[in-house]
């Protein structure tokens, strides 16, 4: 009887997590999500845009394809060779960020480091204004049927947009083939298939469970199927972050 009661309590706990208040979860995660803009600094024109989210107070995850026009793949950037992008935080501040680490095109992940400078909207000049932001926690506990929320900047114009859906399938690399001319776009990582809308500009944003934890990185949606969208699973992101830490710790200290 006691075992049955514990099992029931666990089921109720899981049910409450799955049916959590949607607006509360969104309010919890929005401060950790940013819009990412790749700029031509000579002309001031936007090259591309996407989304990202904080995994530590000053480190942002996004997709590599969001920044591929200015950054090499599978690369650790030294301090004197970084490429800069513009990120817009939840409070509307335009903040400078640096590309510090990229995966290969198949991993499709990249890390940005925010600087202590924002763009003054009145003058367009950089102004020192250091700040830290709340990071999101990763979760590897995901099942088909789980409710999820995709957060991002669709079309590069609608920041902090949220859509909801479920995990439709969990696919290992050998179980799917997506891309032009039958060429895999992501061939090395586990992905989550969801019916939560992922539009251009959503790339790099978080796919969130009802506990406000990241279960995936929104990556792309199929053009001919509105309800088939793919996110890189958080376990692949965790491996990528571990690779960054290993590379960073292996760098020699400056004299």
Model-derived segments and spans:
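Beta-strand/loop subdomains of soluble extracytoplasmic proteins
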Residues: 79-99, 143-149, 160-176, 235
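N-terminal activation segment of mature serine protease catalytic domains
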Residues: 1-53, 60, 64, 240-254
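Active-site substrate-binding loop(s) of clan PA
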Residues: 70-76, 98-103, 117-158, 243
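Short, surface-exposed secondary-structure boundary micro-motifs
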Residues: 65, 153-154, 219-220
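Active-site region of chymotrypsin-like
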Residues: 29-45, 115-136, 160-248
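Catalytic-histidine neighborhood of serine endopeptidases
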Residues: 49, 56-57, 63-107, 116-117
């Amino acid at each position: 009887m006691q075992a049955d009661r514990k099992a029931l309590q666990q089921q109720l706990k899981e049910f409450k997590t799955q049916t959590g208040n949607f607006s509360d979860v969104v309010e919890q995660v929005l401060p950790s999500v940013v819009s990412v803009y790749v700029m031509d600094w000579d002309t001031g024109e936007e090259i591309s845009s996407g989304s990202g989210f904080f995994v530590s107070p000053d480190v942002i995850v996004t997709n590599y394809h969001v920044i591929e026009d200015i950054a090499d793949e599978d690369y650790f950037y030294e301090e004197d060779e970084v490429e800069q992008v513009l990120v817009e935080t939840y409070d509307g501040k335009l903040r400078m960020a640096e590309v510090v680490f990229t995966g290969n095109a198949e991993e499709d992940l990249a890390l940005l480091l925010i600087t202590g400078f924002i763009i003054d909207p009145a003058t367009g000049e950089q102004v020192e204004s250091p700040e830290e932001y709340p990071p999101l926690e990763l979760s590897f506990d995901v099942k088909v049927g789980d409710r999820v929320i995709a957060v991002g900047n669709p079309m590069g114009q609608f920041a902090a947009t949220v859509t909801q859906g479920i995990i439709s399938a969990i696919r290992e690399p050998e179980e799917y083939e997506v891309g032009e001319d039958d060429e895999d776009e992501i061939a090395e990582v586990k992905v989550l298939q969801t019916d939560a809308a992922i539009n251009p500009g959503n790339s790099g944003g978080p796919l969130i469970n009802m506990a406000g934890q990241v279960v995936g990185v929104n990556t792309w949606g199929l053009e001919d199927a509105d309800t088939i969208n793919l996110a890189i699973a958080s376990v692949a992101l965790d491996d990528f972050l571990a690779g960054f830490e290993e590379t960073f710790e292996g760098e020699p200290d400056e004299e």
